[in-house]
């Protein structure tokens, strides 16, 4: 069993447990979606106490026998490391993008080696997606999911709008206020069902996490 201690919605750590069987299912789902093979190079900046590290980057890379490059995120170092390893698959969240934009070389940065990029962990602006596309990223996949319900539950391709057809193993409903319910689990995430966009958390996050670096 894997036990994760997260602190997103509140400052108090939240404990989430996953069996290895469930994690293996999520890892295999990610490998199929990304199309990961031994020819890929994965650049991973997700901390080890996040579900993303296990089901989006590190473990899928291991299972697919891909090359895994793991580093703590720092904007200048990320750009330097990217140039060195030329990854074919990356995963970044909106906060990473905000920090990368502060680097002078970002405006002309070439990311054409990337055939698939995952983003998510909160509302993703179309401006961010378009920025990465303009730098050569072939597919920017906006994955929705969470620690309790590992992503991807559903995906938006090159768009902040999601395809609400859930991936295998998930049943999704929406309450009248737009809150997403996954396999009976109340997520606390509010969507605009008409536009198919992730709007906000139901309760404002007060925790200090890797997402607020």
What are these regions (language model features)?
Residues 1-28:
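Conserved AMP-binding A3 loop
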Residues 14-17, 44, 65-73, 141:
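Short beta-strand->loop structural element characteristic of the AMP-binding/adenylate-forming
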Residues 17-19, 153-157, 175:
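Short beta-strand-to-turn element immediately C-terminal to the catalytic PLP-Schiff-base lysine
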Residues 21, 95, 122-123, 186:
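Alpha-helix/helix-capping structural signal
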Residues 25-41, 49-89:
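Conserved AMP-binding/adenylation subdomain of ANL enzymes
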Residues 89-92, 101-160:
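Gly/Ser/Thr-rich phosphate-binding loop
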Residues 159-177, 181:
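Catalytic cores of nucleotide-enabled group-transfer and carboxylate-activating enzymes in metabolic
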């Amino acid at each position: 069993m894997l036990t994760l201690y997260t602190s997103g919605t509140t400052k108090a750590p939240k404990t989430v447990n996953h069996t290895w069987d469930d994690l293996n299912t999520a890892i295999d789902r990610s490998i199929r979606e990304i199309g990961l093979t031994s020819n890929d190079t994965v650049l991973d900046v997700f901390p080890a106490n996040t579900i993303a590290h296990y089901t989006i980057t590190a473990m899928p890379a291991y299972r697919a026998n891909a090359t895994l490059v793991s580093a703590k995120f720092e904007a200048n170092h990320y750009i330097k490391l990217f140039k060195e390893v030329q990854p074919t698959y990356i995963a970044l969240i909106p906060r990473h993008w905000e920090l990368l934009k502060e680097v002078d070389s970002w405006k002309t940065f070439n990311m054409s080696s990337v055939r698939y990029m995952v983003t998510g962990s909160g509302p993703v602006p179309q401006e961010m997606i378009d920025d990465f596309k303009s730098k050569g990223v072939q597919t920017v996949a906006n994955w929705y999911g969470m620690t309790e319900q590992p992503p991807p539950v559903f995906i938006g391709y090159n768009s902040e709008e999601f395809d609400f057809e859930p991936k295998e193993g998930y049943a999704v409903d929406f309450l009248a206020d737009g809150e997403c319910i996954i396999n009976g689990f109340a997520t606390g995430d509010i969507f605009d069902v008409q536009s198919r966009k992730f709007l906000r958390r139901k309760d404002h996050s007060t925790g200090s996490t890797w997402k607020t670096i």
